[in-house]
């Protein structure tokens, strides 16, 4: 991991005005030379951060039986088929659920009903559930997703993502940034040439450029 990333994070933390609340540390990525009107060129990646997100990640699991029981120890909420059907009759409640939840996980057998009752709400938000296969451990899946962020550019050249909190060390935050930048370089059409600039900042602090 380049020392320049650590230096940029340290500056962002040092230059942030003192606050009496815990601040998020965010990354802004500016893209270039991409036709983002073409959906295939857009960024849409889930990335597990090695140092964690530094924030609470809200995860809802759709499950039944033993899987639902196990999920109760890990997820923020566990919903069954009856609750799922109720959301189909209450669009406002469905939208609230989607807006308050970072990630959804669902047993594969429930995916069809989720598409039926919640697809029009979750789909446009990019929040359709991660399907659980029979051999998947729901607790492991939920715990992994607690450290996951979603990179999504849509049709805009600039997008943001959470990379930590201001009480994490510069090295921890820099490690998260390094993983994100490497993933982008590996998946973008022209690799690093498609990245115009990268900035890191706390919620209320100034932006500091992360050198290439």
Curated annotation (Swiss-Prot):
GO terms for molecular function: rRNA binding; structural constituent of ribosome; tRNA binding. InterPro entries: Ribosomal_uL1, Ribosomal_uL1-like, Ribosomal_uL1/biogenesis, Ribosomal_uL1_3-a/b-sand, Ribosomal_uL1_arc, Ribosomal_uL1_CS. Keywords: Repressor, Ribonucleoprotein, Ribosomal protein, RNA-binding, rRNA-binding, Translation regulation, tRNA-binding. The keyword Isomerase does not apply. Pfam families: Ribosomal_L1 (PF00687). One of its GO terms (cellular component) is large ribosomal subunit. GO terms for biological process: regulation of translation; translation. CDD domains: Ribosomal_L1 (cd00403). Belongs to the universal ribosomal protein uL1 family. Binds directly to 23S rRNA. Probably involved in E site tRNA release. HAMAP family: Ribosomal_uL1_A. Part of the 50S ribosomal subunit. NCBIfam families: PRK04203.1 (NF003244). This is Large ribosomal subunit protein uL1. The lineage of its organism: Archaea, Methanobacteriati, Methanobacteriota, Stenosarchaea group, Halobacteria.
């Amino acid at each position: 991991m380049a020392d320049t990333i650590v230096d940029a994070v340290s500056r962002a933390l040092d230059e942030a005005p003192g606050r009496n609340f815990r601040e998020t540390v965010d990354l802004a990525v500016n893209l270039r030379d991409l036709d983002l009107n073409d959906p295939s060129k857009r960024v849409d990646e889930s990335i597990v951060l090695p140092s964690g997100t530094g924030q609470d990640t809200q995860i809802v699991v759709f499950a039944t039986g033993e899987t639902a029981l196990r999920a109760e120890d890990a997820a923020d909420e566990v919903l069954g088929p009856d609750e799922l059907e109720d959301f189909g009759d209450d669009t406002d409640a469905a939208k609230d659920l989607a807006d308050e939840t970072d990630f959804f996980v669902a047993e594969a057998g429930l995916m069809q009903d989720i598409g039926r009752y919640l697809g029009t709400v979750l789909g446009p938000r990019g929040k359709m559930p991660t399907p659980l296969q029979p051999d998947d451990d729901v607790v492991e899946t939920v715990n992994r997703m607690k450290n996951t962020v979603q990179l999504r550019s849509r049709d805009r050249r600039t997008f943001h993502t959470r990379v930590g909190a201001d009480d994490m060390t510069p090295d921890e935050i820099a490690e998260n940034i390094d993983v994100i930048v490497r993933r982008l370089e590996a998946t973008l059409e022209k690799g690093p040439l498609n990245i115009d600039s990268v900035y890191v900042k706390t919620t209320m602090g100034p932006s500091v450029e992360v050198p290439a």
